[in-house]
Design a protein with these regions (language model features):
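Conserved positions within tandem-repeat grammars
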Residues: 131-134, 157, 180, 203, ...
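Leucine-rich repeat
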Residues: 120, 141-146, 164-169, 187-192, ...
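Conserved hydrophobic beta-strand positions in leucine-rich repeat
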Residues: 124-127, 147-151, 169-174, 192-197, ...
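Alpha-helical tetratricopeptide repeat
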Residues: 2, 7, 16-126, 131, ...
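Repetitive helical segments and hydrophobic/amphipathic motifs
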Residues: 11-12
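A generic tandem-repeat structural signature
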Residues: 75, 81-82, 89-102, 166-204, ...
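Ser/Thr-centric signal marking residues that sit
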Residues: 49, 134, 167, 180, ...
């Protein structure tokens, strides 16, 4: 019995010890970076693929696999859109630089209503503008890599729960619709960097607008806004805010948290000289247009 216990213990130790010698996701990732630095792009892609197979939420591995594919494509004389899905997963799993790369490489060719649902897995940009739509089309859940959507000049009055499938969007154009109410579902689109709501019928914004932490551009020109929610101040990445041609008389004190805001347009609102001075004091480094 003692021998059995001894042999079993030795085998267990050997198995346990050998597991430390097996490459893990981080090992493969580091090897991939080394291969990338040596311009061995095919090997780098393989190494990052191994890392992802062990850790499917490895945002950095997706990012550098995409970068390896981009460099290999340039070397071979083509760029494959395959790298876009890698960049999207990289963004979803926390690699903030990925969204800039997506905007650079993956939003060139937009699919229209007729073609978008034929091969939904290759659709990164969709143009459904001027289609008399009252909602986003059925089947949108199949557009799993959609990052840019143009719904300009339709007949939307609100957003249905179908919009909750579009969590990878970084650019959304809802201008020139008839939206009177922006429901809480807007707060699920947390990767958005650009949101256009010009020429709608909004009188207020939901608290969930504060969930859009990555927003850089928000355009709300020509609505019926009378007040902004205090949590507009949580949009700390915001650089451009267009509130022209609304019914605003004041802005919440929380706008002072918008430290990156470069431009604020308030033309066509009923803002007194005293309130204008207050806003300038809250945003000393922002270019503000009142008229």
């Amino acid at each position: 019995m003692k021998k059995l216990i001894t042999y079993s213990s030795i085998i267990a130790v050997l198995i346990f010890g050998s597991s430390f010698n097996q490459p893990d996701a981080k090992n493969y990732y580091d090897t991939g970076l080394a291969s990338l630095n040596q311009k061995d792009y095919i090997k780098a892609i393989g190494d990052f693929t191994n890392a992802i197979s062990m850790n499917p939420k490895y945002g950095d591995a997706y990012f550098y696999r995409a970068y390896s594919k981009e460099l290999l494509g340039k070397k071979m004389g083509f760029i494959s859109t395959e790298l876009c899905s890698d960049l999207i997963y990289s963004m979803v799993y926390g690699k903030t630089e990925a969204s800039d790369k997506i905007g650079e490489l993956c939003t060139g060719d937009c699919f229209n209503m007729e073609s978008a649902f034929v091969e939904p897995e290759i659709v990164y940009c969709a143009d459904f503008s001027s289609q008399i739509l009252t909602d986003i089309p059925d089947g949108v859940e199949n557009l799993q890599y959609l990052i840019k959507l143009n719904m300009f000049n339709n007949k939307l009055v609100t957003l249905s729960q179908k919009w909750s499938h579009l969590t990878k969007l970084i650019s959304l154009d809802l201008g020139s619709n008839r939206i009177t109410l922006l429901p809480p579902v807007i707060g699920k689109l947390t990767e958005l960097k650009e949101l256009n709501l010009n020429k709608n019928l909004l009188a207020t914004l939901p608290a969930e607008i504060g969930n859009l932490k990555n927003l850089k551009t928000l355009t709300l020109r020509q609505n019926g806004l009378k007040v902004l929610p205090a949590n507009i101040g949580t949009l700390t990445e915001l650089e451009d805010l267009d509130l022209a041609l609304n019914m605003l008389t004041t802005l919440p004190t929380e706008i002072e948290n918008l430290k990156k805001l470069k431009r604020l347009i308030l033309v066509g609102n009923e803002i007194s000289a005293k309130e204008q001075q207050r806003i300038k004091t809250l945003l000393p480094n922002t270019t503000i247009a009142f008229e």
